[in-house]
Amino acid sequence: MPWGPSMGLRLWRFAAGVCAGAAVGVKWNSLFFIAAMGLLTVFWDINARRIVGLHKWGLTALVRDGIPAFFQMIGVGLLVYLSTWAGWFQSSNAYFRRWAVENPGKGVMWLPEDLRSLWEYHVSAFKFHSGLSSPHTYSSQAWQWLVLGRPTSYYYESPKLGSSGCTVKSCSEAILNIGNPAIWWAFIPAIIVALLVLLLKRDWRFGALLVVFGAGYFPWFMYPTRTMFYFYALSFEPFLILLLAGVLGLAL
């Protein structure tokens, strides 16, 4: 079998598609993670066919692995994502719900009216959020996140003597969203070590974690003037934790 086997339906990819659709239903920037992880799995399939010496391993992997992977992850994910809009579809007066009816001949005409309205809703939301730029005391740019340059304030009060347990002239009460400095500052050398291990030892585990971290972090640099906050970094923090654990594991 010079072209190698066809893996058919891979349930773990199907499950990944379900999770992907649910993730995008919560936060759109999940798309970057899904793209990175999906491409990684196809790359691993390509490399596996190359290692066993199959004929035209790159082309066959794209056809026999890449196309099924697309439908199992992206196709399934799209259906799950649309299901998160069930309430919007069932409504008759939701925001943008009647856009296609009120704007005949406009938008993506090959889509059914319901989906055309939903698409325009997405376009409008994307334009608003990607261009959102307004001064905010606790805003922080992406380059500040790893060094905890500007935590996000969730609560602040200045009670005076005799109120809220304050026993001096003036007190401060604050709740800040800030990571553990010992862990977050350790992420930076961990990233550098992981890059060196990847380059020198070709350790795919660090490569995978770096790719997924990059997918969650670097897209934010495309919007240098957008109002952003430190808590945006929480989406890729789990992968940095795994990266740090992997680097510490090198010493064991």
Residue ranges and their predicted role:
Residues 137-140, 149-206:
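Membrane-interface anchor segments at the N-terminal boundary of transmembrane helices
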Residues 24, 213-228:
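Transmembrane-helix signature of polytopic, lipid-linked glycan biosynthesis machinery
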Residues 3-27, 38, 217:
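Membrane-interface alpha helices of multi-pass inner-membrane proteins
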Residues 1, 39-50, 193-202, 248-252:
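Structural signal for the C-terminal ends of transmembrane alpha-helices
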